[in-house]
């Protein structure tokens, strides 16, 4: 349900004091229009008093709640912006991650979050629509840092965030302070993971990335990953989490394992979308791990994944080749 507590209009500074322009009747009339949009609970904030609440009661007291018939869509949201996953390919920026980056890891351990903000700005300017936030470092309080990082970045960056940790308590710490609907990264098909992560997703609301692996590891076959994905979607439903709030990661493995493994992941993308009707995501840069020409390999594999029906990818949006692939794909697939 949506709750609103608006001010009595925008204040004007008169004789050094804020004066709110709306009278109780005007205020109630404005709030009534919001109720017509589907708001369930109403109240008043700055500039209101009991007369305003009485006017609300008089106008809305006998009104029945107008339930909205909302379409089921996959979306992530900040307090200021919503990203829908049925409107073109979506880019999730991966650069706020200290893995393999000593300078960033040192900053996080020292409580300096400015480099995270700088990375957030850089990625947004490069075209990222969602930012992955991973703050795991050795010998640090990851839960506290995640909460502080989420609050800090959200205070200045308008796009949604993806909370990334293998520790469910860290995910909860981030979700608790998040304004909007985040993406939780991630849950997998093991019983213990689902028992820990799904309650967090249900309690705070959000999308969740489901890794297509379980107690048996990563299946070498697309069909095996489909069954794990099916288990994740089915179990999520028992927690009240709809499939529209699930993105399945079909798990990219290094090309060093062979071209067959790379193709099997793409097959899994198509299969899972067709059979389960859920959105799919990949961490593209895993394909080039341990290889020389990483940028070209990442870009080519991203293009192949898009052709297989991939909905979004976790990538470095500042990489020129990645930006070009995404731009050309969205241009050619546009219905405008």
Locate the predicted segments by residue:
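Domain-level signal for soluble alpha/beta catalytic cores
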Residues: 1-247, 253-336
């Amino acid at each position: 349900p949506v709750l609103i507590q608006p001010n009595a209009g925008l204040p004007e500074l008169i004789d050094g004091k804020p004066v709110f322009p709306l009278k109780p009747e005007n205020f109630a009339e404005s709030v009534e229009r919001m109720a017509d949009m589907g708001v369930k609970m109403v109240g008043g904030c700055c500039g209101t008093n009991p007369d305003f609440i009485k006017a609300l009661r008089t106008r809305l007291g006998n009104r029945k709640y107008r339930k909205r018939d909302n379409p089921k869509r996959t979306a992530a949201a900040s307090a200021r912006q919503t990203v829908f996953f049925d409107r073109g390919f979506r880019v999730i920026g991966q650069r706020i991650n200290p893995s393999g980056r000593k300078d960033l890891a040192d900053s996080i351990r020292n409580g300096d979050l400015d480099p995270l903000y700088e990375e957030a700005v850089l990625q947004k300017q490069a075209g990222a629509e969602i930012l992955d936030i991973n703050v795991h470092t050795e010998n640090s309080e990851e839960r506290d840092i995640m909460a502080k990082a989420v609050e800090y970045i959200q205070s200045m960056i308008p796009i949604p965030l993806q909370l990334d940790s293998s520790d469910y308590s860290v995910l909860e710490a981030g979700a608790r302070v998040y304004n909007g609907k985040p993406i939780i990264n991630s849950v997998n098909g093991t019983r213990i993971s689902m028992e820990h992560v799904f309650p967090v997703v249900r309690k705070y609301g959000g999308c969740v990335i489901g890794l297509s692996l379980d107690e048996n590891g990563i299946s070498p076959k697309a069909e095996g990953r489909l069954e794990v994905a099916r288990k994740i979607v089915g179990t999520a439903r028992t927690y009240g989490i709809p499939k529209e709030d699930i993105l399945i990661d079909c798990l990219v493995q290094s090309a060093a394992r062979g071209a067959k493994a790379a193709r099997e992941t793409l097959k899994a993308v198509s299969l899972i979308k067709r059979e389960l009707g859920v959105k799919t995501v990949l961490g593209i840069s895993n394909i080039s791990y341990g290889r020389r020409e990483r940028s070209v390999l990442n870009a080519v594999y991203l293009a192949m994944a898009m052709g297989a029906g991939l909905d979004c990818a976790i990538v470095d949006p500042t990489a020129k080749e990645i930006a070009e692939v995404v731009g050309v794909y969205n241009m050619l697939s546009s219905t405008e």
